[in-house]
Amino acid sequence: MARSYAERANTHQSPVARRLFALMEQKQSNLCASVDVRTTKELLELLDKLGPFICLAKTHIDIIDDFTYDGTILPLLELSKKHKFLIFEDRKFADIGNTVKHQYQGGVYKIAQWADITNAHGVIGSGIVKGLKEAATETTDQPRGLLMLAELSSKGSIAHGKYTEETVEIAKSDKEFVIGFIAQNSMGGQDEGFDWIIMTPGVGLDDTGDALGQQYRTVSQVFSTGTDIIIVGRGLFGKGRDPLKEGERYRKAGWEAYQNILR
C-alpha cells in the first residue's frame, strides 16, 4: 500500500526528505524541473515561471557559461524561497571519497553550500557516501541529502541488474544522508526500515525519445512502477512550449497519478 507524502513527511529519517515531502503536499506537486540551460538569465527566468508548479529544481550548474556565485546562486536561492522549492544539483559524483569531498565543498561552484540535494554513482563503493557527507557537515549546518544513481533512462544504460543491486547496498550505509535514488522502479527497502525517495527522469506526456538515446515513459507508467517525483526538462520549456502552461499540465498529471496509486 502506497503511503502519502504527508505521512512520509512526518516519519522520514532525513530532514531534507521531510521538508521535501511537506512541500510536495503543500503545493500538490511531485514535479522536478530539469533546467539545462546555458545562461544565468535563462535559468532564473525559467525557474521564476516554473517555480509555482514544482517541488524541486534540478540544475547542471557547470553548463552555465556566465556562472558566478553571487550572480547565479544567490538569486537562485531567493527564487527557491519565493516559490518554495528545493534545489537538486545533478552533479553525478563518481570518484574516491577524498576527491568528491573537495568537488562537493570547494572549487568554483561550492555545491554543498547551496544545493539541498545532489547525487552520485555507485561504481566507487560506499566511500563516496562518506566523503560527500563529511563535506556537507563541514560546509553547512543546513541539512543535505544524497541520491544514488540506480537506474537511468537512456538507451543502452548499463545501470541495471547487479550494478543496481550493489548501488542499493551502498545506499544502506547511511539512512539519514542517502534519501533515495534516481531510478525507473521502486528499490524496495521498506521491510528494513528505509523510505527511499524515487526520482524518475525520462518522463514525457508527448514525446517517446530523442536522437541522443533518451527514452520517455508516461507519468502514469512511472508511478505504477514506484516513482515519487517525476523529472521533466524539455517537456516543460522545449521549442514552442509555454513553461506556464506545461508546468501546470505536468504538475496536474503527476498529482493525479500519485492520487491514483493511493486509492
From Swiss-Prot:
Broad class of enzyme this protein falls into: lyase
Any GO BP annotation: 'de novo' UMP biosynthetic process
Pathway the protein contributes to: Pyrimidine metabolism; UMP biosynthesis via de novo pathway; UMP from orotate: step 2/2
Catalysed conversion reaction: orotidine 5'-phosphate + H(+) = UMP + CO2
Listed EC numbers: 4.1.1.23
Gene3D superfamilies xref list: Aldolase class I
Binding site for substrate: 36, 58-60, 90-99, 216, 234
Keywords attached to this entry: Decarboxylase, Lyase, Pyrimidine biosynthesis
Top-level lineage group: Eukaryota
SMART domains: OMPdecase
Xref: CDD domains: OMP_decarboxylase_like
InterPro entries noted in UniProt: Aldolase_TIM (IPR013785), OMPdecase (IPR014732), OMPdecase_AS (IPR018089), OMPdeCOase_dom (IPR001754), RibuloseP-bd_barrel (IPR011060)
Gene Ontology MF: a single term: orotidine-5'-phosphate decarboxylase activity
Active site: K92 (proton donor)
Protein family: Belongs to the OMP decarboxylase family.
Entry protein name: Orotidine 5'-phosphate decarboxylase
